[in-house]
């Protein structure tokens, strides 16, 4: 499995989902959390493609034994946008502030 590593970061930082092109402060966790996982609070590695293995178990990563010389492996990675919309249903908002700005006030709160 020769996967390209896109990002290594801390999930607890407030800007783990932002890039140098998209400067909005957002977490890497999508709205509602990852499906059957939840909220990312620790360090994480973002790789290209998928990774085989049991759900929620440790996956060991190691450096490749041979040096990669192809253009696809040697080109520099620059992420332009990380989608953090909900993975449940038809998510279209990147964070709660964007959702509140679009939908407006949904419920009238009484002062009782």
Residue ranges, per PLM feature:
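Low-complexity, rRNA-contacting terminal tracts
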Residues: 1-112
């Amino acid at each position: 499995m020769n996967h390209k590593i896109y990002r290594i970061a801390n999930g607890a930082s407030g800007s783990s989902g932002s890039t140098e092109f998209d400067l909005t402060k957002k977490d890497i966790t999508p709205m509602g959390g990852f499906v059957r996982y939840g909220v990312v609070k620790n360090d994480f590695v973002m790789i290209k493609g998928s990774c085989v293995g049991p759900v929620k178990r440790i996956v060991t990563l190691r450096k490749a034994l041979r040096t990669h010389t192809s253009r696809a492996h040697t080109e520099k990675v620059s992420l332009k946008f990380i989608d953090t919309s909900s993975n449940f249903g038809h998510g279209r908002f990147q964070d709660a502030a964007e959702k509140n700005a679009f939908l407006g006030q949904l419920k009238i709160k009484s002062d009782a």
